[in-house]
């Protein structure tokens, strides 16, 4: 008899839940709920299980916030809960709550070639360290290492490291943003809001007033070539994405590959492909040769968070991925 577990991927707006075949890892019956419609995550889980007439005793839910102990308070939502209490209330034997980028990193060993688009480099080396990052509402970062036949995710808040410019143009951007926000993290330029920051800094550095644009506006104007400032901002975004990915590769020797998780990059994929991304990735001076064979992939699987939550749980239950 097939055994299923509950898996979830929860952000500030929506909660996506599904069932995972514990043996195969297949994700089934995924459904998205608006977080605004429910008083708690537990309430959403109960609705999902009732709608699908599912009886499960194990679960893993990925959440877009730091996970540091039993008490989980979401960054972009009012939901807050005790993992132990929720596990008890649901009658689960196992309930894992993990960071959303922990889940994405755990999905990587499960991905097939048609779930990936490669941007330069050679072949990944088996069982070597992996980095994953993604620019969306914020900048998420995680690493994955292989230890004793197990994949171990190393979560963190790498998106909040200092933004380190490596060109005159980038130095001007830093100067402009520092005057506005003080500390300038990588997330201040590598995210949806970060794209707006880049555009504003470019315009203000030229002594002009920027328009009140959204990330979508900047992308559209860049792609139809109707705004030089927007095109510069998007080009710079791609280069800095490359630099940041190269930094991750250097830090942990990620010869297993560097992976970009969804976010805003797929919205301008053709532009990204022909941009200075790979040049920025390899622009490491004396250590260019160290990173030039490391492959970079864009993840195009439609639900890596659910896939990774399932992989994390299956490994916790004793399976070898």
Swiss-Prot record:
Reactions catalysed, semicolon-separated, are: D-glucose + ATP = D-glucose 6-phosphate + ADP + H(+)
GO molecular function term, any single one? D-glucose binding
Which BP terms in the Gene Ontology apply to this protein? glycolytic process
What EC class does the entry list? transferase
Membrane-crossing segments per the record: none
Question: Domain of life of the organism in this record?
Answer: Bacteria
The entry's ATP-binding residues are 8-13
The keyword ATP-binding appears for this protein: yes
* UniProt protein name: Glucokinase
What organism is this sequence from?
Answer: Cronobacter sakazakii (strain ATCC BAA-894) (Enterobacter sakazakii)
Species lineage: Bacteria, Pseudomonadati, Pseudomonadota, Gammaproteobacteria, Enterobacterales
């Amino acid at each position: 008899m097939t055994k299923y577990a509950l898996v979830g991927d929860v952000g500030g707006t929506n909660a996506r839940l599904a069932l995972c075949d514990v043996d195969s890892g297949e994700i089934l019956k995924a459904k998205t709920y608006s977080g605004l419609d429910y008083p708690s995550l537990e309430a959403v889980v109960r609705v999902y299980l009732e709608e699908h007439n599912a009886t499960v005793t194990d679960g893993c839910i990925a959440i877009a916030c730091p996970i540091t102990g039993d008490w989980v308070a979401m960054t972009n939502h009012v939901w807050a809960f005790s993992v132990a209490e929720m596990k008890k209330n649901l009658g689960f034997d196992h309930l894992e709550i993990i960071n959303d980028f922990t889940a994405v990193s755990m999905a990587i060993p499960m991905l097939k070639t048609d779930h990936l688009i490669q941007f330069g480099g050679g072949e990944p080396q088996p069982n070597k360290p992996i980095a994953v990052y993604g620019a969306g509402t914020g900048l998420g970062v995680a690493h994955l290492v292989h230890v004793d036949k197990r994949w171990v995710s190393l979560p963190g808040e790498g998106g909040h490291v200092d933004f380190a410019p490596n060109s005159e143009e980038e130095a001007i951007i830093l100067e402009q943003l520092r005057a506005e926000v003080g500390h300038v993290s990588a997330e201040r330029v590598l995210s949806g809001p970060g794209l707006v920051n880049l555009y504003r800094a470019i315009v203000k550095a030229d002594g002009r007033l920027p328009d009140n644009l959204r990330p979508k506006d900047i992308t559209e104007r860049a792609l139809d070539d109707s705004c030089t400032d927007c095109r510069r901002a998007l080009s710079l975004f791609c280069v800095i994405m490359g630099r940041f990915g190269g930094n991750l590769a250097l830090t942990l020797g990620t010869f297993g590959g560097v992976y970009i998780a969804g976010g805003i990059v797929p919205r301008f994929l053709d532009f990204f492909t022909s941009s200075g991304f790979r040049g920025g990735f390899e622009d490491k001076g004396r250590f260019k040769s160290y990173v030039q064979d490391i492959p970079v992939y864009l993840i195009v699987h439609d639900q890596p968070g659910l896939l990774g939550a399932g992989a994390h749980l299956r490994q916790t239950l004793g399976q070898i991925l």
